[in-house]
């Protein structure tokens, strides 16, 4: 599918997101080094943040809505099981977001995910806590599948460094596409943003790794 992670600042915080910190494989594409180095760093930043803010206002309506979504599978006695749902999601990714991509096939995959979300995902059941956990994982996989396809559609060029091949855009690493493409959902719409490959060394950050680490490490 290609390389892709959460875009972070020097506090290991998703860009423009307060109070959320990221560690491990979701924070970098440097394989095992992330697991060895980012947990303690992100923990320090989260601890510092927690000590400097007041208690937030809880949205009871949001909590009840999420509880209804999460526990809906345990209210069903029949339908489809989590294994069937997971197999369907994997098949969509295998068939429509494989190593070689193009816009038509990616859009078909996106329509399949939307159909599964509206139909099969509303019929899945869970008979015990174990099955409920697997169902929730499937819901997350469904969301991430859509995120990945939207990201693939946004990058209209192939790239060796990003392990990304577009059949309809075969030129590899054209200069105008030497950048990251981030996506977010805003008011129900998918928005994109360009970031330089070394944005973490550009203003408002310092130009060197050491300067940034010294400023942000909280040691």
Where are these regions (language model features)?
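Glycine- and aromatic-enriched mobile tails/lids
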Residues: 3-22, 26-219
């Amino acid at each position: 599918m290609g390389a892709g992670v959460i875009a972070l600042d020097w506090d290991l915080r998703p860009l423009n997101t307060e109070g959320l910190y990221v560690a491990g494989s979701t924070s970098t594409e440097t394989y095992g080094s992330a697991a060895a180095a980012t947990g303690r760093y992100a923990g320090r930043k989260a601890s510092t943040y927690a000590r400097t803010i007041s208690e937030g206002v809880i949205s009871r309506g949001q909590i009840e809505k999420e509880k209804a979504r999460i526990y809906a599978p345990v209210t069903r006695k029949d339908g489809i099981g989590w294994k069937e749902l997971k197999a369907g999601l994997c098949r969509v990714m295998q068939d429509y977001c494989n190593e070689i991509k193009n816009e038509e096939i990616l859009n078909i995959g996106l329509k399949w995910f939307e159909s599964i979300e509206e139909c099969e995902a509303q019929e899945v059941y869970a008979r015990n806590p174990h099955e409920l956990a697997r169902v929730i994982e499937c819901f997350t996989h469904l969301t991430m599948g859509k995120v990945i396809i939207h990201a693939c559609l946004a990058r209209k060029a192939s790239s060796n460094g990003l392990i990304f091949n577009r059949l309809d855009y075969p030129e590899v690493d054209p200069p105008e596409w030497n950048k990251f493409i981030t996506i977010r959902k805003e008011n129900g719409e998918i928005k994109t943003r360009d970031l330089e490959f070394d944005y973490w060394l550009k203003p408002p950050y310092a130009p060197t790794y050491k300067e940034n680490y010294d400023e942000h490490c909280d040691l």
